[in-house]
Amino acid sequence: MTDSAAPTAPTHERGAFGHPRGLMTLFNTELWERFSYYGMRAFLILYMTDVARGGLGLETQISGAIYGLYTFGVYALALPGGWIADRVIGQRQAVLIGGIVIALGHFTLAAPLVIPGSDYWSFYLGLMFLVIGTGLLKPNVSAIVGDLYEGDTPERRDAGFSIYYMGINIGAFLGPLVCSYFAEKVDWHLGFSLAGIGMVFGLIFYVRGIPALKGAGELNDEALANRDQGRKQLLYGLIGTAVFIGVMYALVASGTLAMTVVGFAQATGLIVVVVAALYFGGIMAFACRDKVERHRIFVIFLLFIGAAMFWSGFEQAGSSMNIFTRDLTDRVIFGWEVPTGWL
């Protein structure tokens, strides 16, 4: 008699160099998603601050605050995005839905091409779609890569992730070259459109390659058994979020709460710092059983600080460095002006 409940690793058909065929599906999906993300990011703040060529004409400080809130939202929503995938819809569906919402976000940003006068509402609505879509797609596509190598050797898994990250780098390199060029040289909204088209390409590769994923990215038995509970928790979370946003909007609109975009961005940054400090402090004070564990948590905390500083500097490439490059850098080579987003 055999135990039918014993977990078994999914059987994945091998492709190039002995890696699962599903790896190339995720390689192409993430390549085009990063193409769209970094392609749009390369000129986002330029569009916000531009006046002469149909941009939003916002002040640099306000534009920087919006950019900061956008990038914060993209990565912060990876937490609920991963939870929704694990408890309710599965990683495979989360990637598909996230990709569709990302494409919708880029095309919403491009709406002024066909809907004159829609610049402001389409801009904020488009960014909201991008934040939600990326929060669903980004953490879960990486998790599916790990599922493909369940039961495989660590060396092969590491090699698979190296190939996967190569796709990320290719997309991040090509996106600004294409999207930023047409945005700066032709029309800002054409750049948004090209970013959306890139995400559509990624969705096509993903949908066509889903059969190669086999069982990777699907809900496990425990999640399926508790799916109804997960749906209820998700519903409560959405209702709570909607109520919070509605109350905050009413307070700001009525003048009861004086809050600017810059002030909101600064408050968000302060909250993140406080939460991180309380989190690590709580672990060291109440969860660590001995000096060795506290030492290890402290090392993790130092690595956390280093990572935060690195990514804070890295994200300047899409904000302050773009403004510096546009205003204070000679970009003319042999009579041709290099697009700001390329640098």
Identify what each model region corresponds to.
Residues 87-102, 152, 157, 293:
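Cytoplasmic membrane-interface "Motif A"-like loop-to-helix N-cap segments
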Residues 1-19, 151-152, 180-322, 326-333, ...:
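Intracellular loop-helix junctions on the cytosolic face of multi-pass helical membrane proteins
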Residues 41-42, 80, 170-185:
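A gly/Pro-rich, aromatic-decorated transmembrane alpha-helix motif that marks the paired
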Residues 17-71, 302-305, 311-324:
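Helix-loop boundary and gating motifs at the non-cytosolic
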Residues 64-87, 138, 173-175:
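Central cavity-lining transmembrane alpha-helices of secondary-active solute carriers
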Residues 31, 105, 118-137, 304-306:
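Hydrophobic core of transmembrane alpha-helices in multi-pass small-molecule transporters
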Residues 136-151, 318:
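Intracellular juxtamembrane helix-capping segments at the cytosolic ends
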Residues 97-118, 123:
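C-terminal ends and interior cores of transmembrane alpha-helices
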